[in-house]
Curated annotation (Swiss-Prot):
This is Translation factor GUF1, mitochondrial. GTP binds at residues 74-81, 138-142, 192-195. Its main location: mitochondrion. HAMAP family: LepA (MF_00071). Residues 65-245 form the tr-type G domain. Its EC number is 3.6.5.-. It is a peripheral membrane protein. The keyword Glycoprotein does not apply. SUPFAM superfamilies: EF-G C-terminal domain-like, P-loop containing nucleoside triphosphate hydrolases, Translation proteins. GO terms for molecular function: GTP binding; GTPase activity; mitochondrial ribosome binding.
Amino acid sequence: MRGCLQSVRLLTTALGQSPRRPLPFAFRLPPNASRLFSTCASRAAATAKKPPSELEERILAIPIERYRNFCIVAHVDHGKSTLSDRLLELTGTIEPGSNKQVLDKLDVERERGITVKAQTCTMLYNHKGDDYLLHLVDTPGHVDFRAEVSRSYASCGGALLLVDASQGVQAQTVANFYLAFAQGLELVPVINKVDLPSADPKRALEQMETTFELDTDKAVLVSAKTGLNVQQLLPTIVEQIPAPIGDHTKPLRVLLVDSWYDTYKGVILLIRVFDGSVKAGDQLVSFATQKKYIVGEVGIMYPNQTAQSVLRAGQVGYVYFNPGMKKSQEAKIGDTLTKVGSEKLVKPLPGFEEPKAMVFVAAYPVHADDFPHLEDSINQLLLNDRSITVKKESSEALGAGFRLGFLGTLHCSVFQDRLQQEHGANIIITPPSVPCKVLWNSGEETVITSPVDFPDGDSNRMKVKEFQEPYVLTTLTFPHEYLGKVIELCEGNRGEQVSLEFFTASQVILKYQLPLAQLVDDFFGKLKGLTKGYASLDYEESGWRKSNVVKLKLLVNKMPVDAVSRVVHISQVPRLGKQWVTKFKEHVDRQMFEIVIQAAIGNKIVARETIKPYRKDVLAKLHASDVTRRKKLLERQKEGRKKLQAVGNVVIEHKAFQAFLSK
């Protein structure tokens, strides 16, 4: 301890001494030693004053006219992330073969071959002697992440419209094309996977021409996997995609494209600078939350975070604050940021909207002791995904848990995978359900996300004017030979046909209005089964409609099992009721008394199964001729069972719920 105090005194004396006076020990502190004890803010300022690197000098020398911001529009699994890797290799951003799916950071993205979070990467490309700054934004392809897709498109000036040569145009290609078209992006047709034996580039080009009315003469045919013709894409990007419009002399205007959480830096924002410039030390304000932040660092993704002294109009990069933004809920996708004092000089960028949860599940730990771990795991994942809604709830059967809201079924499935892979959570998940709107006689409206809140008693039903459920406009693409089966599936799920179009001799685009509740009930799995995996699906919200929905309950010896209840359409009740009681019977152990399993809506029983009790042979020691004694013992056994059934609790193991709730 005495030695430590002496060292501290020596350091303190050294820092206070004049530089001319020699130090009392051999080690001489550098002139800027006081920075070792400086605050984070001064450290950020010091970072900003560092001399620019060779990379930064090249970037600063490039005018906005030689910027190109682009993304890749594609259906799931058409090779978007692989093509991104090839472009990064060709521009020298990464070493050839050094990584795969560089822009897919999550384990679940690499395993499923999908993109969940929007990512970006900056590339430098020399074309005809001039340096060009290319910003590639890798966007999710699935409908559940449409908010991230549309915000990413808003930060771009053009897009590569990527189509698989063997599969052709698919549902999400169509949906994402219209999103890109609505943003006014310049589209470059690209046919991928031309090296496959099943590839038919000519058919894919015809589909693009007839479906999107694009000039396919300039289309580029590539194989992202082998690198075939990918080098032709870079000159095409430079020549066909326009430069971003912006002025670095105007007041700062920044679009928030995405965000992620860092343990040390807090929330890091992915931004597109539309006007002005931003650097460390600037104070920014959010139009959505009105909160103010001091910039700690700005930089580009090259492909990892690479600090820069400034981000100028037209650039896509990252920013984090000091002190850091601690809550990801403050980072709202589509929000506009500007410098403090410029709020009245800048109009917020259009298109900002809060993401709405449309699919809800309940999550419970398999063991009650794991609840704190589950809560901590969910909170950590929420740091990177602000679109999930969380509410604590309790079930008599399963204990404490959470009601979670997601953008869609894939979003829910990805979240569940991340809970298990990244945090080792062992959980029970209820089947997905959708919100229900209640219009009361008083004129009020209530959106119900949990079956517990559904007004199913007679007194409550009297106060209800009507129930409504959400509908979606569904776009399905598939080979024409499956048309009859697909129409039958849609009609069987309460669908209403909107349009039918043959966009090639063999492919059909079918549009249906469907209840969202039917869509989340494994509709896509049934569609894939009917079409042997050749169908694709996309959907968009289509408002609320009046509906005859009821709360279906599961009763065990007349006691409701709250964790299993669901709000369903009246037409599904007979099928689901019978399915429930039959399946639940398989997983409940026999008891010493009779167990009655029932499915009910209100006071009406719609299905029933019975589990017989264990039978004790009370007549084993009796003589065959003792009839009165026989009757007496059987009557006493019968009364005992009734009494046991009245006071006994049915023991239902967690594994029974796990098996029942699994598909």
